[in-house]
Curated annotation (Swiss-Prot):
InterPro entries: Acetaldehyde_dehydrogenase, Acetylaldehyde_DH_C, NAD(P)-bd_dom_sf, Semialdehyde_DH_NAD-bd. It comes from Rhodococcus jostii (strain RHA1). GO terms for molecular function: acetaldehyde dehydrogenase (acetylating) activity; NAD binding. NAD(+) binds at residues 10-13, 159-167. This is Acetaldehyde dehydrogenase 7. Belongs to the acetaldehyde dehydrogenase family. The active site is at 128 (acyl-thioester intermediate). It is an enzyme of class 1 (oxidoreductase). Keywords: Aromatic hydrocarbons catabolism, NAD, Oxidoreductase, Plasmid. Its EC number is 1.2.1.10. GO terms for biological process: catabolic process. It catalyses: acetaldehyde + NAD(+) + CoA = acetyl-CoA + NADH + H(+).
């Protein structure tokens, strides 16, 4: 018995999610793909797969036959659109998974805090950069207090559709906040780079944590354990290089970090 889901947003993220569920999931079934452009590539491809589609947004989803059988709705639109979508769907008691930076519900990073948010009706998946990096910040903060954490997410420009590009500011704000709330850093900062390299590169992220005295081996062990946990649900997730730890003595000025973390 599969759980029926709907996906709002027929752009890159929504379409990719649709194919991942169709090809890989044994527990979920895509019962609808929702967009606003009847000529969008995502809706066309879903139609060819026999998946019910609508180009009338969330209003069209409410009218799709079998809507009452849908249990989970993934929203892959934009931060602003999700606010309206969540309000429209609230009376129907659906589980909402927010793939935008709107963050109406709690931030959820599965390897860190999934269990404590299972009862939430609207969960926010932060951002792609947040999902990749926050587990590492949390791994460090599990061993030692993190005064400041900074992440740089570099993704292929081709993978960023109009929705992602329109949400760059929200991306940095939401990810920065989640670094603090979920990652455990006192202050967080996020930077996104859309790399136009061709052929497109695989997403890479860099994480910097500023901590006090700590057991270096314990930090490395914590990071490696968390990498193993994430790789269980994100195939291919790995450290590109081993954990680097640099001791900063009192006579070395932290000119940049000092200004940011004050």
């Amino acid at each position: 018995m599969t759980t029926k889901v709907a996906i709002i947003g027929s752009g890159n993220i929504g379409t990719d999610l649709m194919f991942k569920i169709q090809r890989l999931s044994q527990t979920l079934e895509v019962a609808a793909l929702v967009g606003i452009d009847p000529e969008s590539d995502g809706l066309q491809r879903a139609g060819r797969l026999g998946i019910p589609i609508t180009a009338d947004g969330v209003a069209g989803l409410l009218d799709i036959p079998g809507f009452d059988q849908i249990s989970i709705v993934f929203d892959a639109t934009s931060a602003r659109a999700h606010v309206a979508n969540a309000a429209a769907l609230e009376p129907f008691g659906k589980q909402l998974v927010d793939l935008t930076p709107a963050a109406i519900g709690p931030y959820v990073v599965p390897a860190v805090n999934l269990e404590e948010n299972l009862a939430a009706r609207n969960v926010n998946m932060v951002t792609c950069g947040g999902q990749a990096t926050i587990p590492m910040v949390a791994a460090v903060s599990h061993v030692a207090p993190v005064a400041y954490a900074e992440i740089v997410a570099s993704i292929a420009s081709r993978s960023a559709g109009p929705g992602t590009r329109a949400n760059i500011d929200e991306f940095t704000e939401t990810t920065s906040k989640a670094i603090e709330v979920v990652g455990g850093a006192h202050r967080g900062k996020a930077i996104i780079v859309l790399n136009p390299a061709d052929p497109p590169l695989i997403m890479r992220d860099t994480i910097l944590c500023l901590i006090g005295d700590a057991d270096h081996d314990a930090i490395r062990d914590s990071v490696h354990r968390r990498v193993a946990e994430v790789s269980e649900y994100v195939p291919g997730y790995r450290l590109k290089q081993d954990v680097q730890i640099t001791t900063v003595t009192d006579d070395v000025p932290l000119s940049t970090l000092g200004r940011v973390s004050q």
